[in-house]
A protein has these predicted regions:
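Conserved, well-ordered alpha-helix/loop/beta-strand core segments that scaffold catalytic motifs
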Residues: 1-38
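Beta-lactam-recognizing serine transpeptidase/beta-lactamase-like catalytic domain environment
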Residues: 34-35, 40-105, 110-231
Length: 231
């Protein structure tokens, strides 16, 4: 637990200045500074059984200060600098269980599993180009991170490589059922409804069960009808 808390704090400190985080497990150098990286969370899980090994949120506070009555000064120090900013660092919010965030590339597991269960071979491959336009030449471009960083691409990519290198375009392809790089379309089309179905199967619309011991917020899987009503 102590290692997790120290690592989280150290990474954020290095990230804010674009420096190097050093640890006994290896070093990580950040190429640029992210001055607003003031908060974060880490959960370490046993990949074999799902047990939570450690959990940390930053910034945090010492709960012992509340035992005999916290001072006004100490209590004010626990308040977010801007109470109108929901993203402001807040020591009293456990981001690991109370923060609700977009899942980012971890969601690729949902899309991949939905495609596999519907018959896609993991050997299905595309020739990744780094960037595609889903709606034609004048539409908004969608790109891989490697494209944004170096105008490069992942090349020949099957599901295994797509997961290993987090290839965005591969998952756009198997999710939509159309190969926008010019090759053969995947044998299945999962579509939005299929992805939503599997997101719910993964429990992304439910509590984890930790809320019996720790205050928890649950995620929300998008609803197509609700999306149309708000756009």
């Amino acid at each position: 637990q102590e290692d997790t808390e120290n690592a989280l704090k150290g990474v954020l400190e290095a990230l804010r200045v674009g420096g190097t985080y050093k640890s006994k497990y290896g070093n990580k150098t950040f190429s640029s500074a992210a001055k607003n990286a003031a908060s974060g969370a880490v959960i370490a899980i046993d990949a074999k059984n799902g047990d939570v090994l450690s959990m940390a949120s930053y910034p945090n506070y010492n709960p012992n200060k509340f035992v005999n009555g916290i001072s006004y000064e100490d209590y004010q120090a626990l308040q977010p600098k801007n109470k109108n900013d929901v993203l402001a660092a807040n020591p009293q919010v456990n981001l690991a269980t109370q923060g609700v965030f977009q899942p980012g590339s971890t969601f690729k597991m949902v899309t991949g599993m939905a495609a596999i269960d519907n018959g896609l071979s993991p050997n299905y491959a595309i020739q990744d180009t780094g960037v595609i336009r889903l709606g034609g030449p004048k539409s908004r471009p969608f790109a891989d991170l490697i494209w944004h960083k170096s105008r490069s691409n992942h090349g020949y990519t099957d599901l295994y490589k797509a997961i290993q290198e987090s290839c965005n375009i591969y998952f756009y392809t198997i999710g939509s059922g159309k190969n926008y790089t010019g090759g053969k379309d995947p044998s299945v089309k999962v579509g939005a409804k299929g992805i939503i179905e599997y997101a719910k199967k993964f429990g992304l619309d439910d509590y984890t069960g930790l809320n019996e011991e720790i205050d928890e917020r649950k995620g929300s899987v998008p609803n197509m009808a609700a999306k149309l009503e708000t756009t």
